[in-house]
Amino acid sequence: MSLTRLLIKDFRNIENADLALSPGFNFLVGANGSGKTSVLEAIYTLGHGRAFRSLQPGRVIRHEQEAFVLHGRLQGEERETSIGLTKDKQGDSKVRIDGTDGHKIAELAHLMPMQLITPEGFTLLNGGPKYRRAFLDWGCFHNEVGFFTAWSNLKRLLKQRNAALRQVSRYEQLRPWDKELIPLAEQISTWRAEYSSAIAQDMADTCQQFLPEFSLTFSFQRGWEKETDYADVLERSFERDRMLTYTAHGPHKADFRIRADGAPVEDTLSRGQLKLLMCALRLAQGEFLTRESGRRCLYLIDDFASELDDARRGLLASRLKATQSQVFVSAISAEHVIDMSDENSKMFTVEKGKITD
């Protein structure tokens, strides 16, 4: 699906905007602080229920307003879908799909698979394991129907188990939680392992095009010892877990390691190379989704020129065009994106929260 229309009300510094969008490239050009990134963030929020620069809803609601409103129209091959999200300062959300309320944010995420590339996105590579788990979980969410429910139940059970660790004295008292936790943990780990294995060649091929000077390898670590039953791990770790008051092993401790020439990428690659790698991974993930399901990603790219020279920008642009996906790109100057423009693209100018085309 592509986003054909976007309405924004009281989001960041944007009071009102009604944008007719291209199914191809959409460029948002403006000075720093103009609001161009806010447009990208509005699209992201419409598909995720939260902003990517702040987790506190009050910070993205326009000054002295009580709530923001986002509305979009999605055009698929056979039908059009209307979606909407309202969120107030207390964080209460209302999701509307095709005119009916009561929907879940996960439904928006399913309708709008998107990849985000920002200057802060290096955390995928040099941040903690949670960012790389999120990378795998994005793929599992869009690939496995039962993943989101299983993942939500796992989070709930881990929270309950950690609370129980403060109160119990014998492992047998934890068995009611572990009886539910173990099959969920094993299923989620299986999904992650299968996904990381399935997409590995796509990632290797794309990374080779972007960073031919490096040999990159990828490895999934499930969060507990190989060839060890998770039930045994939980029982054996009980005393340590009780002392720590949290569960030290499990899928919530998984990681997806990326190495260049045998060394961690964060220790080997320059900032420009890290950005290229991040772009390559996001592209590979989106292309894999399209090949497996026929669904296309929506790409959000903030500050396109940052860290990339002309040749690398050209390579990224050509690969994005080849996906035939909808792409939103912000830039300080039109000169940075003019080579990407064609007869199907749209150029928006953003100034102090006002957007014109």
UniProtKB/Swiss-Prot annotation:
PROSITE patterns: RECF_1, RECF_2. The keyword DNA repair applies. It is found in: Cytoplasm. ATP binds at residues 30-37. Belongs to the RecF family. The RecF protein is involved in DNA metabolism; it is required for DNA replication and normal SOS inducibility. RecF binds preferentially to single-stranded, linear DNA. It also seems to bind ATP. This is DNA replication and repair protein RecF. It comes from Salmonella paratyphi B (strain ATCC BAA-1250 / SPB7).
